Amino acid sequence: MKQTLPALLRTLPLLFLSCSAGVLQAQVFSVSELRCEQSQRPLAVEPAGPRLSWQLNADRRGCLQSAYRILVADSPVALADDNGNVWDSGKVFSDQSVLVPYGGPALQSGKAYCWKVQAWDADGNVSPWSLPASLGTGLMSLQDWNGAKWIAMEPDVDSLKCIEGNTGEWKDGGPVFDKPVAPYKLPQLRREFTATKPVKRALAYICGLGQFEMFLNGEKVGDHFLDPAWTKFDKEAQYVAFDITGELRDGKNAVGVMLGNGYYHTPHGRYLKLLFSYGAPKMICKLQIEYADGTAQTVVSDDKWRASESPVTFSSIYGGEDYDASAVQPGWAEPGFDDRKWKNAVLTQGAGVKLIPQISEPLKVMERIPTVRRFRAANGNWVYDLGQNASGIVQLTVRAVTPQSIKLIPGELINDDSTVNQRSSGGPVFFSYTTRGDGSVESWQPQFTYYGFRYVEVEGAVPAGESNPGALPEVIDITGLHTRNSAAQVGTFACSDPLFDKIHSLIDWAVRSNMASVLTDCPHREKLGWLEVTHLMGGSIQYRYDISRLYAKQVNDMRTAQHADGMVPTIAPQYVTFSPDFIDTPEWG
């Protein structure tokens, strides 16, 4: 017994170590959050060398990746069998898990791939395979567009193109707005086609300049706002990919596209910071349909598309937008619509721009801001207070018994007489809606512009339930739609001091209201990508939002804007050449 007890005590540490090792081996770690080019399920990445990222998860501290293995396959079935029939990286000894370059054979344009990852920790333990992720490659060259053409409703007026913008400042001898800009009408275009077999996968690739909205069988495709992202359109334009598999019908289908001006063409008539034009609104489009039997079909933009004026009668990225609901042609984006009064689209050049996939997250309606109070101004107009200053547009809900025009005047401030004040934000800016006037409830919101505002002054209508001797349209509701870049929120802040919380909220609203497809200086007066904002705010914003794709786009804008002598101007995209005091100065860019 004297010898047995010391022997038992000597074995206890060994037993403890053995049990500990078993516990360590039982501890779990896994791989998740797979991304390609910082996007979870991209539909159109550049086929040449996409970069892959993932996160390591563990139930203990200090778990580090020591190696990884990536499988890329051309079908979910192959990937489920652990068959990387496109690329098997093998076991790679590396702790890298962010933007790992794809190292397999060249990927094909316009194809779908799937991939997964497993990792090893520092102790040599291997994780399970991650859940599969998907990636789609974009269109690498114009040949991949299968003959798609740039089309428009009317040809460019080359003599009135004005590539370099003017700022509207007065100089000796008169204003610099001395060059007219063509009064292009805003088009809608349509095309019918037939899906002849069961569909496996269908994608739409589209670029509409300056902005576009796409419709399939009468419904808007996607939830994006102000597509595509702003670029220097004489050099580069970005196309957007949509998965339309679920929207296609067996048999007859119809695709429709509405075009807005955006930063492609800034018309006269209202407030504008810059005056320039790249030409008439235009678009290029390819629908790629893959059938279950392995065959394929493409529908491309050409002069067989039909074109007509849209109900959007005025649109300016600066000055606002007008819409005439009495001019709506019901069913125009549905199969069977009678378009005999329409005309064929015209072929146009598209200025020979380079087409690349959209880089940043799209803009979207990210929040609805209801009216908190309303009051009457001295001029008799009604003013709606949303209680929050934000970037976005107005959603109007109204009822009218005859076609009448309603003017919505947005602003951040109000005057002493309670009318909206636009002195510091740029004016005149307004949204105008002409009702159908059939007695039903109508709802409308601008499609191709936005502003920064808290108040909305309504001219030509009264709130429902108020005295209405003039039989004006009755406003049922005014709601603010906050639009911004849809970069995901990744951080939060809260503390015990209400003042700090309020300061954080104030700054956060300012940041998100200036997150467009560039980081703007303001959401109304200029809307330009001043690069000092990108530089000074980036380090802070990344703690609140995932701006990786937005900043990739901004860097691309800087590269495109760079001059031959190496100088990067203070704004990118460079829509205007400022004076020497502003074009190259560190405090502004």
Sequence positions of predicted segments:
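Short, intrinsically disordered, charge-balanced linker/junction segments flanking boundaries
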Residues: 25, 333, 581-589
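Well-ordered alpha-helical segments within folded domains of soluble proteins
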Residues: 531-542, 548-552, 585-589
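Extracellular/oxidizing-compartment recognition motifs
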Residues: 29-112, 116-525, 532-533, 549-552, ...
